Design a protein with these regions (language model features):
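Bacterial N-terminal signal peptides that target proteins for export
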Residues: 2-13
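Bacterial N-terminal signal peptides
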Residues: 14-22
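Predominantly soluble domains enriched in secretory-pathway, periplasmic, or organellar proteins
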Residues: 24-353
Length: 353
């Protein structure tokens, strides 16, 4: 009897550990995009930026991938109604965005050209384009993927996707508006900045969490988060600095990974499909994640790491932005490559949850 009891205790302990690592919820409520407001825009819509001062939402787009159609288009929407207030033509296709609201600059990643264009949000005119990739040198050639701003240290971090083991991390001095550093052998994909903690967290296509010094941009630490699984390809990370954790979106494998920021230790797996964007809302203690292939957005409780709600979308949700009052979530939603319908923006009223 004692032996049976010991076996039962071990079984319950193993079950508890498994549940703690793989947190889910059978009580999650499902919404559809029809519960919210949407606005069709056009083809090739990618990242979003919310401007509090103008009460505007910017959406970057690359309308065509034809070789002779390299122009980009930035949509400026009224944040409340999603009415299109302006269509801003750009010389290069636009994908990634980062907004410096105080200095009225919207940084736009030109993926295919390996550059970043600076847009004056007061005039809707381009200020300049920073050419980061050097096509004449294979060691310095890469496509821009993500741009993330560190306002405190006046830096813009830009990930460059190159050939295998040839990824680059560009550091732009935003005061001088010029390239300050180029870091190699990091294979960066996505970033998140902890300005107060003077840290920059980088996730890589090889499943690494990389930590940089926010003051110097120098490497402090790099660790494989889940070395047992070689299939990881981390796209983005969101920070919950109050709890000292990060939430990682992985495009190759299922689950949102919750990691300890100072060590890279894997703490939890939140059961979800493979992911693209991830965003943390400290005001509501929620994490939002887009799942392109499964056409849904997850709302995760950051206090319990359990799924709270699911929003089903008609097309493929891509990028996210949050209003300054933390009550509205915006998502860009993409159609399939051969679809005739326009990509669109979804405005999600979080007070409905």
């Amino acid at each position: 009897m004692i032996k049976a009891s010991a076996v039962m205790n071990k079984t319950l302990c193993a079950l508890a550990i498994s549940l703690a690592m793989h947190s889910g919820s059978v009580f999650a409520k499902t919404f559809t995009e029809k519960d919210f407001v949407s606005q069709p825009l056009g083809h090739g819509v990618y990242e979003l930026a919310w401007d509090k001062g103008q009460q505007a939402l910017y959406a970057a787009s690359a309308p065509s991938f034809d070789k002779d159609k390299t122009d980009g288009l930035v949509f400026k929407l009224a944040a409340q109604s999603l009415q299109i207030d302006a269509k801003i033509p750009m010389e290069r296709r636009t994908f990634a965005v980062a907004l410096d609201e105080e200095n009225h600059i919207l940084y736009l990643g030109n993926a295919l050209e390996g550059s970043v264009t600076l847009l004056d949000t007061r005039t809707d005119k381009a200020i300049k384009t920073l050419q980061l990739s050097d096509n004449s040198d294979p060691e310095k050639r890469a496509h821009v993927r993500e741009v993330v701003l560190d306002k405190k240290h006046q830096r813009l971090y830009v990930s460059g996707i190159g050939r295998k083991d040839k990824g680059l991390l560009w550091v732009v001095d935003t005061q001088k508006q010029e390239l300050a550093q180029t870091l190699q052998k990091l294979e960066p994909v996505g970033f998140a900045v902890d300005e107060a903690g003077d840290r920059v967290y980088v996730v890589s296509g090889s499943g690494e969490l990389i930590t940089l010094d926010g003051k110097t941009s120098q490497l402090l630490n790099r660790v494989k988060v889940d070395p047992a699984d070689p299939e990881h390809y981390f796209l983005n990370i969101a920070l919950n600095t109050a709890r000292g954790v990060g939430y990682i979106a992985d495009t190759n494998t299922k689950d949102v990974l919750v990691v300890q920021l100072d060590s890279g230790k894997l703490l939890h797996r939140v059961p979800t499909p493979n992911s693209v964007a991830v965003l943390y809302n400290p005001a509501r203690e929620e994490v939002y994640v887009t799942h392109r292939n499964d056409r849904q957005i997850s709302v995760i409780d950051a206090t319990s790491n359990r799924l709270k709600h699911t929003i089903k979308t008609t097309a493929m949700p891509n990028s996210l932005a949050l209003s300054a009052d933390a009550s509205t979530l915006y998502a860009s939603v993409k159609q399939g490559e051969k679809a005739n319908q326009a990509d669109y923006v979804l405005k999600i009223d979080l007070t409905k949850f």
